[in-house]
């Protein structure tokens, strides 16, 4: 076991504080509408330019082990806020740095660290309650666009696309962000349920220009096993032919004789038909077939349920207004399933999302929910260079999370003002002793840090801005760093999601409280590298 180095009390806290400052100072330059960029060197490819706090934090690794511990603890604040709210990482970092600094001063002057932490926790709970009481529910599309614009660092185009996407697919819908092949940013919305399986034979194609199969008002047969001959299906096929409607077959696979028979029937014009493979694998495939059945009002033909292919009748087939099949995906539009059944299924999937501990499973369940509840929107981010596209994509991701958070818990005045106003909740707060009171006051001072930093990044004097804001008591009265104006921030469109502000404060206080109560630090001693031995003389005669 390698030898360890141990640091205590002031020495430990000083080193840790140095690490905290290095990381926070690199991250906080990105805060606010006039925040600057950070350039990150990459071992391969072009350097990365970003204004995303968590991306900067994740890149920082310090040589001194003790300083690095402080930096990594602070990085945890940014990562946690990013995981929970998806934005507000820079605000959380700035708050954590301010609380740690104030806390370290208090501990150095002889205060009890545990009581300080209790005071910090009391203050944070009171401020969070005040924030929740003042949060305003988001209703209008324009407000969603404003939240998106602010999180994308003032890019109105991104805000507009996000608002449009959320309007089209709903709050439950999946919105994905991809890199575009062109210089333009564009939005594509897939309405209905889409899954990534295409036609099994190009002979099924009905629209030669677009190379796709289009079936209007088709019947849909959902079968979980392979189909290798059609003998068992003949009764239902005859019934479909008599109805004059097209047929879509979704099965594990359609092969050999079965596929050949379907193709021949299609080419002769006897039956408008297309076949696709079922999406997913294993248990997920069963669940997705059940989703399709509920969406289309059909029944899954499954031996588990005791349903044989021979006994399938027309009323067991699903229906949809339209089905469009391309080489690699199938879209079912306007399924005929009952609204109550679809709502029941979405409630069941939501419950599974709550229970699951796996991020992968959660993502897949959310995709299934979106396909049932709304649709899928894809924002393709374009730019002139790869570096620009990556930087813009970071901002779109932030903005997407922020708009979701805003819909979830409402909005607050932006620019750090909500925290500044919520401080009044600390006025009547009762504490058990003086050290806890110092912990509360410490949060009162630290909470000004985001406003001060936004002002500093915009080239203004933080203390003057804070002083002017304190003169007015209205909750939404603040300073717009973009235009250098004072007024109602809601009216100016300077708003933050309540969830982002709340999460930033709670995560910052949580990690800062741990740092303040740290009394000893242990790290591996750096190994002393032995000087390389000189090569032996080669016995040369002169």
Curated annotation (Swiss-Prot):
Query: Which reactions does this protein catalyse?
Result: ATP + H2O + a folded polypeptide = ADP + phosphate + an unfolded polypeptide
Cite the Pfam families for this sequence: Cpn60_TCP1
Q: Where in the cell is it found?
A: Cytoplasm
Q: What Enzyme Commission number(s) does the record list for this chain?
A: 5.6.1.7
Question: InterPro entries recorded for this chain?
Answer: Chaperonin_Cpn60_CS, Cpn60/GroEL, Cpn60/GroEL/TCP-1, GroEL-like_apical_dom_sf, GROEL-like_equatorial_sf, TCP-1-like_intermed_sf
GO terms under biological process: protein refolding
- Which residues are recorded as binding ATP? 30-33, 51, 87-91, 415, 496
Q: Which UniProt keywords apply?
A: ATP-binding, Chaperone, Cytoplasm, Isomerase, Nucleotide-binding, Plasmid, Stress response
Molecular-function GO terms, alphabetical: ATP binding; ATP-dependent protein folding chaperone; isomerase activity; unfolded protein binding
Keyword match Cytoplasm: yes
What EC class does the entry list? isomerase
The domain of life for this entry's organism is Bacteria
Predominant location: cytoplasm
Matching entries from SUPFAM superfamilies are given as: GroEL apical domain-like (SSF52029), GroEL equatorial domain-like (SSF48592), GroEL-intermediate domain like (SSF54849)
The family database entries (Gene3D superfamilies) matched by this protein are listed as: GroEL, GroEL-like equatorial domain, TCP-1-like chaperonin intermediate domain
The subunit structure is: Forms a cylinder of 14 subunits composed of two heptameric rings stacked back-to-back. Interacts with the co-chaperonin GroES.
Identify the NCBIfam families for this entry.
GroEL (TIGR02348), PRK00013.1 (NF000592), PRK12849.1 (NF009487), PRK12850.1 (NF009488), PRK12851.1 (NF009489)
Q: Which family does it belong to?
A: Belongs to the chaperonin (HSP60) family.
Q: What is the protein's given name? A: Chaperonin GroEL 5
Q: Which organism is it from?
A: Rhizobium meliloti (strain 1021)
């Amino acid at each position: 076991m390698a030898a360890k180095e141990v640091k205590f009390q002031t020495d430990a806290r000083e080193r840790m504080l140095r690490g905290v400052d290095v990381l926070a100072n690199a991250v906080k330059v990105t805060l606010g509408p006039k925040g600057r960029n950070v350039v990150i060197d990459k071992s391969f490819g072009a350097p990365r330019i970003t204004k995303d706090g968590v991306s900067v934090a994740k890149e920082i690794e310090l040589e001194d082990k003790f300083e690095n511990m402080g930096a990594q603890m602070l990085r945890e604040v940014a990562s946690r806020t990013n995981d929970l709210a998806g934005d507000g990482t820079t605000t959380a970092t700035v708050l954590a740095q301010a609380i740690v600094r104030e806390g370290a001063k208090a501990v150095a002057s002889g205060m009890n660290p545990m009581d300080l932490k209790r005071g910090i926790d009391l203050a944070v709970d009171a401020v969070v309650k005040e924030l929740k009481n003042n949060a305003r529910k988001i209703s209008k599309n324009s407000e969603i666009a404003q939240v998106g614009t602010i999180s994308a660092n003032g890019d109105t185009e991104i805000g507009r696309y996000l608002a449009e996407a959320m309007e089209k697919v709903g709050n439950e819908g999946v919105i994905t962000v991809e890199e575009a092949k062109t210089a333009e940013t564009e939005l594509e919305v897939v309405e209905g349920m889409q899954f990534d399986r295409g036609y099994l034979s190009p002979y099924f194609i009905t629209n030669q220009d677009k190379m796709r199969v289009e079936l209007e008002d088709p019947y849909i047969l959902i079968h979980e096993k392979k189909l290798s001959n059609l003998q068992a299906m003949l009764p239902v096929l005859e019934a479909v032919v008599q109805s004059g409607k097209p047929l879509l077959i979704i099965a594990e696979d359609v092969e050999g004789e079965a596929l050949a028979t379907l193709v021949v029937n299609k080419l002769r014009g006897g039956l408008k038909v297309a076949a696709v493979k079922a999406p997913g694998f294993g248990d997920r495939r069963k669940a997705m077939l059940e989703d399709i059945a509920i969406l289309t009002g059909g029944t899954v033909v499954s031996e588990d349920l005791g349903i044989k292919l021979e006994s399938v009748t027309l009323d067991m087939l699903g229906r949809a207004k339209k089905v469009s099949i391309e080489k690699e995906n199938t879209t079912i539009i306007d399924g005929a399933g009952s609204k109550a059944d679809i709502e029941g299924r979405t409630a069941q999937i939501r419950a599974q999302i709550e229970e699951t501990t796996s991020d992968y499973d959660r993502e897949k369940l959310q995709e299934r929910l979106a396909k049932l509840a709304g649709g899928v929107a894809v924002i393709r981010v374009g730019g002139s260079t790869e570096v620009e596209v990556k930087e813009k994509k970071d901002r779109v991701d932030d903005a997407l999370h922020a708009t979701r958070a805003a819909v979830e818990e409402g909005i607050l005045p932006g620019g750090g003002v909500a925290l500044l106003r919520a401080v009044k909740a600390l006025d009547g707060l009762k504490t058990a002793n003086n050290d806890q009171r110092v912990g509360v006051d410490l949060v009162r001072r630290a909470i000004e840090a985001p406003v001060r930093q936004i002002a500093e990044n915009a080239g203004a004097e933080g203390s003057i801005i804070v002083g002017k804001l304190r003169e007015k008591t209205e909750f939404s009265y603040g300073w717009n760093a973009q235009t250098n104006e004072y007024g109602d921030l809601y009216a100016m469109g300077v708003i933050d999601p309540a969830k982002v502000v709340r999460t930033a404060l709670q995560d910052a206080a949580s990690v800062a409280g741990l740092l303040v109560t740290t009394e000893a630090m242990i790290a591996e001693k750096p190994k002393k590298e032995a000087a390389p031995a000189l090569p032996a003389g080669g016995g040369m005669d002169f």
